[in-house]
């Protein structure tokens, strides 16, 4: 009880002194119709996905129909989709066993998405892969380069027409 008493008498008083003035006004909400009518895709409803080193996998308690890459020889998953927006949901973990994927859209590398994150705890994270004003047909490739043993979990995709 001495610890708790000390906390309430000393620590909370110090916190009150160090907080300063806090602006309690919230910013105006931002609304965009751009992401309305987003569609969900996973291995249960996506067709035409070329898998090389990836395999269908129950990736997470809330995402049962994803894909897993596990190995060191490299691999990819590739598909074609008509969309204006594409998001990838992947699993983050604070572990060197989780790797980074290079994302290619229409043959050009657009980003690398690392699933080894200091704040990862097997949680889903979203990465924007395409964010265009107009819908168009795109070829998307998620590529794992050869190297150290690594794992990468793609849980699902979201897209807007």
Q: Model-predicted segments: where are they?
A:
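Glycan-recognition surfaces in beta-rich domains, encompassing non-catalytic CBMs
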Residues: 3-161
